Amino acid sequence: MAASLRHMAHFQKALLVARSAPRISTIVRATSTLNDGASKVPDHSMHFKLERLWAVGMLPILPASYFIHGPVMDAVLTVALTLHIHWGIHGVVYDYARPYVIGEAAAKAAHVGVYLITGLLLGALLHFNTNDVGITKAFELVFSL
């Protein structure tokens, strides 16, 4: 019993010394929050809404282009399709061709490639509209087969 009391006194003394000693690890209050990284990323919600509104706005253009032919409808359909395709490809590249996945140089090349494809598509459709029957007349010819 005497040994256990001696051990208890030794334990209490060690506990008091431990409480009065400086801490090895102290709590450091940081001024940052978990949302600091999120504030650096641009907000794409407005782009997403605009893309959806654009897709809904294209719904009446597609059937109307079957019945209305002319350079104005060709230009409207060309711009609408080009923007819609550009935003779709851009979204895929933005989501899947990130620098930490495929590398910095490949990610930049992928983003440049999106604009290159968009420019080529717009140029090809405008060339087709001016030097051939036009995109609306071409749709009518395809559907008449």
Curated annotation (Swiss-Prot):
<dbReference type="GO" id="GO:0006121">
    <property type="term" value="P:mitochondrial electron transport, succinate to ubiquinone"/>
</dbReference>
<keyword id="KW-0809">Transit peptide</keyword>
<comment type="pathway">
    <text>Carbohydrate metabolism; tricarboxylic acid cycle.</text>
</comment>
<dbReference type="InterPro" id="IPR034804">
    <property type="entry name" value="SQR/QFR_C/D"/>
</dbReference>
<keyword id="KW-0496">Mitochondrion</keyword>
<keyword id="KW-0479">Metal-binding</keyword>
<protein>
    <recommendedName>
        <fullName>Putative succinate dehydrogenase [ubiquinone] cytochrome b small subunit, mitochondrial</fullName>
    </recommendedName>
</protein>
<comment type="similarity">
    <text>Belongs to the CybS family.</text>
</comment>
<dbReference type="Pfam" id="PF05328">
    <property type="entry name" value="CybS"/>
</dbReference>
<feature type="binding site">
    <location>
        <position position="96"/>
    </location>
    <ligand>
        <name>a ubiquinone</name>
    </ligand>
</feature>
<keyword id="KW-0249">Electron transport</keyword>
<feature type="binding site" description="axial binding residue">
    <location>
        <position position="84"/>
    </location>
    <ligand>
        <name>heme</name>
    </ligand>
</feature>
<keyword id="KW-0472">Membrane</keyword>
<keyword id="KW-0813">Transport</keyword>
<keyword id="KW-0999">Mitochondrion inner membrane</keyword>
<dbReference type="GO" id="GO:0006099">
    <property type="term" value="P:tricarboxylic acid cycle"/>
</dbReference>
<feature type="topological domain" description="Mitochondrial matrix">
    <location>
        <begin position="96"/>
        <end position="108"/>
    </location>
</feature>
<keyword id="KW-0349">Heme</keyword>
<comment type="subunit">
    <text>Forms part of complex II containing four subunits: a flavoprotein (FP), an iron-sulfur protein (IP) and a cytochrome b composed of a large and a small subunit.</text>
</comment>
<dbReference type="GO" id="GO:0005743">
    <property type="term" value="C:mitochondrial inner membrane"/>
</dbReference>
<keyword id="KW-0816">Tricarboxylic acid cycle</keyword>
<feature type="transmembrane region" description="Helical">
    <location>
        <begin position="109"/>
        <end position="129"/>
    </location>
</feature>
<feature type="topological domain" description="Mitochondrial intermembrane">
    <location>
        <begin position="130"/>
        <end position="145"/>
    </location>
</feature>
<feature type="topological domain" description="Mitochondrial matrix">
    <location>
        <begin position="1"/>
        <end position="45"/>
    </location>
</feature>
<dbReference type="GO" id="GO:0048039">
    <property type="term" value="F:ubiquinone binding"/>
</dbReference>
<keyword id="KW-1133">Transmembrane helix</keyword>
<feature type="transmembrane region" description="Helical">
    <location>
        <begin position="75"/>
        <end position="95"/>
    </location>
</feature>
<keyword id="KW-0812">Transmembrane</keyword>
<dbReference type="InterPro" id="IPR007992">
    <property type="entry name" value="CybS"/>
</dbReference>
<dbReference type="GO" id="GO:0020037">
    <property type="term" value="F:heme binding"/>
</dbReference>
<dbReference type="GO" id="GO:0045273">
    <property type="term" value="C:respiratory chain complex II (succinate dehydrogenase)"/>
</dbReference>
<feature type="topological domain" description="Mitochondrial intermembrane">
    <location>
        <begin position="68"/>
        <end position="74"/>
    </location>
</feature>
<keyword id="KW-0408">Iron</keyword>
<feature type="transmembrane region" description="Helical">
    <location>
        <begin position="46"/>
        <end position="67"/>
    </location>
</feature>
<comment type="function">
    <text>Membrane-anchoring subunit of succinate dehydrogenase (SDH) that is involved in complex II of the mitochondrial electron transport chain and is responsible for transferring electrons from succinate to ubiquinone (coenzyme Q).</text>
</comment>
<dbReference type="GO" id="GO:0046872">
    <property type="term" value="F:metal ion binding"/>
</dbReference>
